[in-house]
Amino acid sequence: TGTDLYHDIAGNQAAQHSLDLAKRLIVLQPYGIHALPDEYQKKTVTVLQSAKPPAVLLKPLKHNFEVTVVGNLRAVKDPFRTAMASRLLPDDSRIVVTHIGAALTPSMNTRANREEQINHRYTWRGSLAQNLTLKAIARSRLLVVSSKMEGGANVISEAIVAGTPVLSTHISGSLGMLGKDYPGYFPIGDTVALAELLLQAETDTTFYKQLRDHCLKRAQRFNPAA
């Protein structure tokens, strides 16, 4: 996981011992290899997580520009960053935020319910079955990954194969999947920068096409047959 790769290995002796014992290590995107100490890199391979688009693709919402966030509500995911950014949008923006994921603590549950009450753009759907989640991603105009760290988020591959562009924090796990030249990055925790990207994607068709075309070019990498 991202926490293992980008946090625990550096100071966790048990994690380091596991690396010593392993004959082969797998990371989920190519940048992950460089997060490992030099002595482990030679026995490390990259395996991208594959994904299949849903069998039935739903049409995007007609009157709203739907943005989806997928992931359980944990601090490392910075789960309310997109909701916070949506509050900064101008009144005439059609952006709405659909949030899919379970609240793993009572405080996260309270925060999600409170956000729904104060933010008319935000809807929290809780945990959904995988097929429903994939349909929601495919219906969306954008997927946002706001995590502080990721080993290689499978939701990115699910969005890419569904033809849904991604906005992501500028983190190694996303750089390895989307490429360093992808135009849809924002700094960790930067609500204003995310709001600006959201509005640009909604209002600038050229920018949105750049995001979409870039993702479509990478879709074959996540084909199960690849």
Q: Model-predicted segments: where are they?
A:
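A charged, aromatic-enriched C-terminal amphipathic alpha-helix characteristic of glycosyltransferases
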Residues: T203-A226
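A short, active-site helix/loop in glycosyltransferases that binds the activated sugar's phosphate group
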Residues: L21-T44, A51-V56
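Aromatic "clamp/platform" in nucleotide-sugar-dependent glycosyltransferases that forms part
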Residues: K148
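Short alpha-helical donor nucleotide-sugar binding micro-motif in glycosyltransferases
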Residues: L19, S127-L128, K135-S140
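Conserved donor-binding/catalytic core segment of Leloir-type glycosyltransferases
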Residues: L58-P90, V97-I100
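Nucleotide-activated donor-binding/catalytic signature segment of Leloir-type glycosyltransferases, i.e.
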Residues: T110-N131
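Conserved acidic donor-binding segment of nucleotide-sugar-dependent glycosyltransferases
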Residues: K180-T191, Q200-T205
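Short hydrophobic beta-strand element within catalytic cores of glycosyltransferases
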Residues: P165-S168
